[in-house]
Amino acid sequence: NDKKFIDQIDYFLHKLTKEIEKAGFKLNKNKTNLNFKDSRQLVTGLVVNKKINVDRRYYKETRAMAHRLYKTGEFQIDDKNGTLNQLEGRFSFINQVQRYNNVIDSSKHDFNNLNAFEKQYQAFLFYKYFYANNKPHIVTEGKTDINYIKAALKKHHLEFPNLIVKKEDGEFDFRVAFLKRTNRLAYFLNIKKDGADTMKNICKY
């Protein structure tokens, strides 16, 4: 943090090397850089300064992948067709970094105050849950409704073979999915954990 250390660089490196070797390690000079705390430091896709940020190129690539997915139904990662889970992993990684920064700044962060990236993530989540899902999604009003519906379907599975099938091992295979209300969906899509306004909020998109 002391920018005057550059005037004593040789002494500093000697002391640093001595401490590292004392701990049983060896300093690799080819992979060692000295930076000020506000210098741009790139580590595995992260720009590590006083405030952590995602490398701009990583963000742009993720946004481009999502755009191609929405337009064509597919996208590539390293010249191979990517999966929805892979793309969600990239969005989730960026979001984790931004959530950390949101905690330390003084701005308001909620559904009505999404930044540019969060709006991109919002669009992806809507695409995943309400467009690209491979099963019809049932949206319930209360969080316990899912348990009651599942229990009823199991009891009457022979009457609703398009919704549920009992397998040979006795387990049930649901042909429908249930939307689980999470903090993430509440933040990005305004889908609260309880409430009757869920369908109204979904239809806004």
Model-based region annotation:
Residues 4-121:
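Right-hand nucleic-acid polymerase module
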Residues 111-205:
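Acidic, divalent-metal-binding catalytic cores of TOPRIM
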Residues 2-10, 188-193:
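Short, flexible/disordered intra-domain loops and linkers
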